[in-house]
From Swiss-Prot:
Protein name per its UniProtKB record: Chaperone protein DnaK
Pfam families per the UniProt record, alphabetical: HSP70
Keyword line: ATP-binding, Chaperone, Nucleotide-binding, Phosphoprotein, Stress response
Function of the protein: Acts as a chaperone.
UniProt source species: Pseudomonas savastanoi pv. phaseolicola (strain 1448A / Race 6)
């Protein structure tokens, strides 16, 4: 079986991992870092930048630089959280034909799974470069509190990226896997508190030894899919904007370039305040008016930051209480608290978690890498490389259908262990009713309209009968990915209808296939771009070496030879400026051909007069005592 990689597709950063020789390895990307910013940029020349390269140019290209797109995945445009996001991001969030939230770049509408696929492609290539072989299968993580639409959309993103997604696994569960694999035998209960860039999850997980097998059972999960580090950044940005307005009377919110610089400064300040008690944000030439350029200089203390975000941190406590209640466990019975997600590095978050659970969180789990590592372990379990692990996850939200009076009737309660299957018999509401509409819902409210609508389908041709007589059996089947399959059957006729829930949200099969084709075209374009760059580099090197050879040859070169070489050099330099790889290669060959006689002449002369050839080397000998300095790149630790 092929290698199955583990990918943490994060809101702010993403990470890829593999199980190798029994050990989990987090793979460094081409830039040498173990995490990759989940940022995608579309350059004017059509090039797609992903990760650090996209982040670097964000200030000069804010409208076409997309970040935190995971917050939009599987969501409707009209949702309050999406409307709130529209006010905060410099790129354009638009309404798709099916009502979903999409983004628009350079006049082209794109679905969030299509954009997330670019990050997954980067993770896939990172793994392939390390392993030296093609990678086609992956386990991808999602927030535990993701609903069905969001899980389906994540799976679609994997397909568009050319990956067969073997399993969708919840992020806290993955972190528990990474933590629990090497722990001593015996039963213990852990809390995974996962506050990432865009989402918050908390899970109560029991790790037990059953017949020599590590069993990870999720007892309960809760969370908020629109609460994370991005919200903390927004509070800081708002503070900086207000301070600047007080000082200069100018509002920066209408200036996308200024807002992008502020976003980067806010993120940097937030990170610095986790280890320092004060920092200064200094952004020269942030804007200008008739009197000249304006500069933003703001000092901010850790206590000020904490006062700005205290309510956000407090919002994580209610889900913790609910998860403990659903699990039927007192907080005193928790053995370990595991912090996951970059935002948990904030001292205020750590303090609140310690106070709530009555114990310090463990420090031996890397909050940025644990999720990807757990995904890699699950991949190894599915591949058969790890045999002593059993993972029992849960469905995070109640699933049911709309019944008479606009009531939601539950079929599968929240925190039910998955995979699971449940059937229930319903009947008609009117006499001689010949069809029923099955409206599938997800959520905790009794009123159907207050829950998330996952889809509708009809069961028709029911034989005429008084109301309440026909027996319609509705079956809900949740697979190991947490994705729902629904069926309805008329028990009298045996007629049935079923769907995988993605009907009223998400991408159609045709759209996914088109995006897969587009991704393949992009891969081909990337390959061509690399080949063109290689040809240009080869041409540049030849131009440089030929000019040096002509200069060294001096009067040994005839006027005719010099003219021919100069013409070939000019032709090659012109070709290098163009985009035609074949033309560059042809001009390289032409220059090599006309300069070959000169090279042969120089070589023959050196062979006849070795002393003369050695003389320049002797003159340069004095430099041999110079020692090359060794420089080490210092990376910012986040």
């Amino acid at each position: 079986m092929d290698r199955i990689i583990g990918i943490d597709l994060g809101t702010t950063n993403s990470c890829v991992s593999i199980l190798e020789n029994g050990n989990v390895k987090v793979i460094e990307n081409a830039e040498g870092t173990r995490t990759t910013p989940s940022i995608i940029a579309y350059a004017n020349d059509g090039e797609i930048l992903v990760g650090q390269s996209a982040k670097r140019q964000a200030v000069t290209n804010p409208h076409n630089t997309l970040y935190a797109v995971k917050r939009l995945i599987g969501r409707k445009f009209e949702e309050d959280v999406v409307q709130k996001d529209i006010q905060m991001v410099p790129y354009k969030i638009v309404k798709a034909d099916n009502g979903d939230a999409w983004v628009e770049v350079n006049g082209q509408k794109m679905a969030p799974p299509q954009i997330s696929a670019e990050i997954l492609k980067k993770m896939k290539k990172t793994a392939e470069d390390y392993l030296g072989e093609a990678v086609t299968e992956a386990v991808i993580t999602v927030p535990a509190y993701f609903n069905d639409s969001q899980r389906q959309a994540t799976k679609d993103a994997g397909r568009i990226a050319g990956l067969d997604v073997k399993r969708i696994i919840n992020e806290p569960t993955a972190a528990a896997l990474a933590y629990g694999m090497d722990k001593a035998k015996g039963d213990h209960t852990v809390i995974v508190y996962d506050l990432g860039g865009g989402t918050f999850d908390v899970s109560v997980i029991e790790i037990a030894e059953v017949d020599g097998e590590h069993q990870f059972e999720v007892l309960a999960t809760n969370g908020d899919t629109f609460l994370g580090g991005e919200d903390f950044d927004i509070r800081l940005i708002d503070y900086f904007v207000d301070e600047f307005k007080k000082e200069s009377g100018m509002n920066l919110k209408g200036d996308p370039l200024a807002m992008q610089r502020l976003k980067e400064a806010a993120e940097k300040a937030k990170i610095e305040l986790s280890s320092s008690t004060q920092t200064e944000v200094n952004l020269p030439y942030i804007t200008a008016d008739a009197t000249g350029p304006k500069h933003l200089v703001v000092k901010i203390s850790r206590s000020k930051l904490e006062s700005l975000v205290e309510d956000l941190v407090q919002r994580t406590i209610a889900p913790c209480e609910m998860a403990l209640k659903d699990a039927g466990i007192d907080r005193s019975k928790i053995n370990d608290v595991i912090l996951v997600g970059g935002q948990t590095r904030m001292p205020l978050v750590q303090k609140l978690v310690t106070e709530f659970f009555g114990k310090e969180a463990r420090k031996d789990v890397n909050p940025d890498e644990a999720v990807a590592m757990g995904a890699a372990i699950q991949g190894a379990v599915l591949a058969g490389d790890v045999k002593d692990v059993l993972l029992l996850d849960v469905s995070p939200l109640t699933l049911g259908i709309e019944t008479m009076g606009g009531v939601m009737t539950a079929l599968i309660e929240k925190n039910t262990t998955i995979p699971t299957k449940k059937s229930q018999v319903f009947s008609t509401a009117d006499d001689n009713q010949n069809a029923v509409t099955i409206h599938v819902l997800q959520g905790e409210r009794k009123q159907a309209g207050q829950n998330k609508s996952l889809g509708k389908f009809d069961l028709a041709e029911i034989p005429p009968a008084p109301r309440g007589v026909p027996q319609i059996e509705v079956t809900f089947d949740i697979d190991a990915n947490g994705i729902l399959h629904v069926g309805a059957k008329d028990k009298a006729t045996g007629k049935q209808q079923s769907i995988v829930i993605k009907a009223n949200s998400g991408l159609s099969e045709e759209e996914i296939q088109q995006m897969v084709r587009d991704a393949e075209v992009n891969s081909e374009e990337d390959r061509k771009f690399e080949e063109l760059a290689s040809a240009r580099n080869q041409g540049d090197a030849l131009v440089h070496s030929t000019r040096k050879m002509i200069a060294d040859a001096g009067d040994k070169v005839t006027a005719e030879e010099k003219t021919a070489v100069e013409a070939a050099l000019v032709a090659l330099e012109a070709a290098i400026k163009g985009d035609d790889k074949a033309a560059i290669e042809a001009k390289v060959e032409e220059l090599s051909k006309v300069s070959a006689p000169i090279a042969q002449k120089m070589y023959a002369e050196q062979a006849e007069n070795p002393e003369a050839a050695a003389k320049p080397a002797e003159e340069n000998g004095k430099a041999d005592d110079v020692v090359d300095a060794e420089f080490e790149e210092v990376k910012d630790h986040k």
